[in-house]
Amino acid sequence: MGCAPSIHVSQSGVIYCRDSDESNSPRQTSSVSQGPTAPLHGLFVQTDAADAMPPSRAAGPPGAVRVRRSRAELGSGSSTGSSGPATTTCRGRRRHCCSSAEAETQTSYTSVKVLLIFAKEDSQSDGFWWACDRAGYRCNIARTPESALECFLDKHHEIIVIDHRQSRNFDAEAVCRSIRATNPSEHTVILAVVSQASDDHEEASVLPLLHAGFNRRFMENSSIIACYNELIQIEHGEVRSQFKLRACNSVFTALDHCHEAIEITSDDHVIQYVNPAFERMMGYHKGELLGKELADLPKSDKNRADLLDTINTCIKKGKEWQGVYYARRKSGDSIQQHVKITPVIGQGGKIRHFVSLKKLCCTTDSNKQIHRIHRDSGDNSQTEPHSFRHKSRRKESIDVKSISSRGSDAPSLQNRRYPSMARIHSMTIEAPITKVINIINAAQENSPVTVAEALDRVLEILRTTELYSPQLGTKDEDPHTSDLVGGLMTDGLRRLSGNEYVFTKNVHHSHSHLSMPITINDVPPSIAQLLDNEESWDFNIFELEAVTHKRPLVYLGLKVFSRFGVCEFLNCTETTLRAWLQVIEANYHSSNAYHNSTHAADVLHATAFFLGKERVKGSLDQLDEVAALIAATVHDVDHPGRTNSFLCNAGSELAVLYNDTAVLESHHTALAFQLTVKDTKCNIFKNIDRNHYRTLRQAIIDMVLATEMTKHFEHVNKFVNSINKPLAAESEGSDCECNPTGKNFPENQILIKRMMIKCADVANPCRPLDLCIEWAGRISEEYFAQTDEEKRQGLPVVMPVFDRNTCSIPKSQISFIDYFITDMFDAWDAFAHLPALMQHLADNYKHWKTLDDLKCKTLRLPSDS
């Protein structure tokens, strides 16, 4: 790339080799070049030549082959020159490619990374270093067990070479075990370098090495070619096999998320694998199927008597079979499937497995309608059953060719116009809503006038942008409801010139002398006793707030994150987690009456409680759980104690930055990631790979943005229509098997996570009465303070009823529960089964209703205060 690499030695003793960020020189500064190397997986790989060499090795080993390169070989920007240090290299090399047939089955990866763990430099470590250099591997050297583990967790090497010749510097087997205890080591090959056995001693057994986690043993030999041969054998043997195993993990992940039912059997028809879609379709759990013969499962009596013999005759010849087959579900129902069975040739050129793909043959009403329209309109291209069954995936749309040909008798014009019209049609029908509109338009053609007019009205509604949001004006003219809707569901009313509200955060740190815990085991006994009850919904967060001096988030976070194995998933230490929780909590404003770290801890507690419910747990994987807990922790970080509407009306810096759209929610997520990644001491994401990080980050952002109230009804209605209604139909024994619930589909997992954090965020009315009353007082005080400031600054008062002199808190709570809470928690309860919460909600509503009937505007009756 034209840059000179630099060598960095960390404080922990790892020699890190990387390209220099400071050099922009296009010149080649190395006096040592590399020859051709062995192929790796048949892919072109460019490396930076083991990152770099230690200074002592820069001149090359004795007898090293030096190859001069032409400008063409080095590239136009990498000519040899005299500038730059003469002992550093920046080389790229290319590997030859395998056949296209093999390449199609491979997964790409960068050059092999090797970690050498030697306490001191000697001829053996030199031999492996130069062998790595010759092979084009990226190489690091670690001198201590601690630095070795740190380096491995950072770079995830494919090969690790550990010096096992002497034990006075470190215990090689202990080092190996510590590496094997980490998740990234699953596909790593670890090589032990052992001393040559003397002639009078019997050669030692390799079993202790294997038990410690080593894969291979290498007899001490400092010859570069011996080390090179060993590494090349490992690359072409174990490393390549490990990459195939990694690819298998990806394949099985794809199978688990595939919408088609997949069944894999052995050559004697013993079931060896079924995916979740198969379980949903057939009603069995895979534990009931694995290891059973297909002949032992119940059969449907709707198939032809000779169908099974026909299928077996076909597939035993190595031919693929596909057709319609009736299967019997666990419930006893017969379902019609389109089945495709493929024999898999394995060892010895014989059939070793059969892979079956199964789809339900269920024609929806819309498909029937389209089929009828095609038939009635005389479109003969779709009249053959076979053609109809195997036509384009866009079968739910009207054929463009038949439409365009109706009004024209000029074939040449039609032929010229058809390709462009088809392209336009293919662009517009991809969106699901467009498919729906096309189906309705087709249905109108043969419908009575009254039905056609009704469908016109349906089309008008479908063409609006807010399909899931209710018409707010249809609600009763209750001022409390109107103010809540205006204050929480709009991003601002109007901008008043000259009234710029500059948002400045004021972080309040507690000055108590309560020492922070290093781990969950170091929590003071008084706090630990409170946290013993944190799994209960009735957990009192205010007691934790008091005993922790308004720092409940760190302590509850340590306990909850430990319970869900967050550190293990993120591959970080509890010290890093504690530092992160401290930073996040420090950026909550303790001066806020409501939006402070106690509210964040309360939302974290509710989220953890929901994650423990059986159906929620069964719908999400561990990444979802970790993302939900992190999102709950950061969802209101740096909240100013003012609503989005206030910030937009005041022209705050944040409102300008985020274009008056989801201002606070966008700020919470952005700041949370900024705080996390700017300091490695609190960066809980530093040890996860890029793909996991991006997936986790996207999930966290999506959940925090879901707490914005402007899309409240959209999220709730999508959840009801996509999750609750299919579940209800399933429980009622619906005959339609076309659309299984699919709670584990990614799009449905997103809806579940959004609904979960939304409910956790506003769960105060579902808490025990004393807690509910305290939260009501706090949120009212925060709204009162906002109204006071709006009046002082001459800003629009977005919630006039929250005037501390006239407000009825019971009325505001009743309106909030009626408008936002009841329907949402009814839907969430139908999914997660939360009878205790719903009872609290009913009791609390009764409390507020009693106060309102008595014309009491306070939190409690005066006699109860």
UniProtKB/Swiss-Prot annotation:
Return the EC number.
3.1.4.53
Bias-annotated ranges (Polar residues) = 23-36, 402-415
SMART domains (UniProt xref): HDc, PAS
Question: Where is the PDEase domain positioned along the sequence?
Answer: 519-855
The biased composition feature labelled Low complexity covers 75-90
Distribution of this protein across tissues and organs = Widely expressed.
Q: Which residues bind a divalent metal cation 2?
A: D636
Its pathway?
A: Purine metabolism; 3',5'-cyclic AMP degradation; AMP from 3',5'-cyclic AMP: step 1/1
**UniProt keyword list:** cAMP, Hydrolase, Metal-binding, Phosphoprotein
> PAS domain spans which residues?
247-318
Q: Where is this region: Disordered?
A: 17-40, 52-92, 373-415
Which Pfam families does the record associate with it? PAS_9 (PF13426), PDE8 (PF08629), PDE8A_N (PF23198), PDEase_I (PF00233)
* One MF term in the entry's GO annotations: metal ion binding
* Active-site annotation: H595
What is the top EC class of this enzyme, as a single word?
hydrolase
**What does the entry give for GO biological process?**
behavioral fear response; cAMP catabolic process; negative regulation of insulin secretion involved in cellular response to glucose stimulus; negative regulation of steroid hormone biosynthetic process; neuromuscular process controlling balance; operant conditioning; signal transduction; visual learning
* InterPro entries associated with the record: HD/PDEase_dom, PAS, PAS-like_dom_sf, PDEase, PDEase_catalytic_dom, PDEase_catalytic_dom_sf, PDEase_CS, PDEase_PDE8
The lineage's top-level taxon is Eukaryota
What family does this belong to?
A: Belongs to the cyclic nucleotide phosphodiesterase family. PDE8 subfamily.
The record's function comment reads: Hydrolyzes the second messenger cAMP, which is a key regulator of many important physiological processes. May be involved in specific signaling in the thyroid gland.
Q: What is this protein called?
A: High affinity cAMP-specific and IBMX-insensitive 3',5'-cyclic phosphodiesterase 8B
| Organism (species) | Mus musculus (Mouse)
Read off the lineage from the record: Eukaryota, Metazoa, Chordata, Craniata, Vertebrata
